Structures are given as structure tokens and as C-alpha cells.
Amino acid sequence: MAREPREGGRGGRDREREGDDLVDKLVTINRVAKVVKGGRRFAFAALVVVGDQKGRVGYGAGKAREVPEAIRKATDRAKRAMIRVPMKEGRTLHHDVAGHFGAGKVVLRSADAGTGIIAGGPMRAVFESLGINDVVAKSLGTRNPHNMVKATFAALERCASPRTVANRRGKKVSDILGRRDVAGTGEAAADV
């Protein structure tokens, strides 16, 4: 009698299922050297961004003697460190947000439909994996890809939908968005 393979097991909650259609983007690959008694020992470091293009994204770094092994390690780490980002209309951010990591600072702005992804290389990979189609992003400070990606994730973690903000404050979504009736005039308040 043949056994059916079980799902789950040790650490099973961290593993991705087959139907998760993840997109992975290689942000950078770098040759690094470890100096040992007999000379230098070379290895490769990879930075990978993984996302489902529906609001989940993660990044990971991996290092190994061979390039494919470094990419595999980075991809596995990225899959384990995924975050969910709320998106407006499934195409952009709900609000403008800034984030920083080390000397890297990024500013992310929501954009109108048809704007596209206006962002530098490492940030572009994050947005494409995330599934954001319209965003304007600017990187200030460092141009180091690792710090840019980490600063972008710091900014994305600060994003919140109006519903989340309303629940946190104990208010209605209409109060957060400023769509109240002003003294019975029938006009929506713009500056609340």
C-alpha cells in the first residue's frame, strides 16, 4: 500500500503551496570574497524579491559558492518573509508614505491610473512583484540596492487602508475619508 504524501509537517506553514504563482525578480548579484590563509575564497551574494502580484511581497538575500545556489537561498528566504500590502483599486497605494533604512530613504506616492511604475531599479522590482501598476517613487540618499529594498519595505509596512485606520481609531471609514455631510447642506466636507 503506497502512502499519500502529507501536506504540512515540520515548518509546513512557512512553505508555499503549488498554486501560489509567485513571481521572483533578481535585484542584484554580487561577487564577494572571503580572505583566508591561502588567499581569497570567492562566493556570490544575491538579492531577490518575490511576490504574487496581488498584494503580497517579500525579499531575501542569499550567499553561496555558485550563482544558482545563492539565488535559490535568497528566493527561499524571500518566500518566508512575505508581507501583505493593502492596495487601492488593486493598482496603487492608498496614500503617500516614506520609509528609511540606514542612509537609504524612499518616498512612495500613489498615482492616477495609467501613470505606470516610475521608480528606480530595485524599487521597480518590488512594485512589479507586488502587483502595483501606478506609483511614483523616489530614492534619496544611498544607491545601495539592499538598503533601497529595505527602505521600500519599511515604507510599504507603514501603508494602511482607510478601513484599517478607521478600526484602529474607532471611527467610520467615511470619517477618515472626510465624506461627511456638512450641517445638512448636502455637500461633502473636503477638509475635515
UniProtKB/Swiss-Prot annotation:
Protein's GO biological process: translation
Molecular-function GO term, any one: rRNA binding
Domain of life the protein comes from: Bacteria
Keyword terms, alphabetized: Ribonucleoprotein, Ribosomal protein, RNA-binding, rRNA-binding
Domain S5 DRBM as annotated: residue spans: 22-85
Membrane-spanning segments: none
Cellular component annotations (GO), alphabetically ordered: small ribosomal subunit
Protein's job: With S4 and S12 plays an important role in translational accuracy. Located at the back of the 30S subunit body where it stabilizes the conformation of the head with respect to the body.
Similarity field: Belongs to the universal ribosomal protein uS5 family.
Domain notes: The N-terminal domain interacts with the head of the 30S subunit; the C-terminal domain interacts with the body and contacts protein S4. The interaction surface between S4 and S5 is involved in control of translational fidelity.
Assembly, per entry: Part of the 30S ribosomal subunit. Contacts proteins S4 and S8.
PANTHER family found in the cross-reference section: MITOCHONDRIAL RIBOSOMAL PROTEIN S5
NCBIfam families xrefs: rpsE_bact
Protein name per UniProt: Small ribosomal subunit protein uS5
Organism encoding this protein: Gluconacetobacter diazotrophicus (strain ATCC 49037 / DSM 5601 / CCUG 37298 / CIP 103539 / LMG 7603 / PAl5)
Gene name as annotated: rpsE
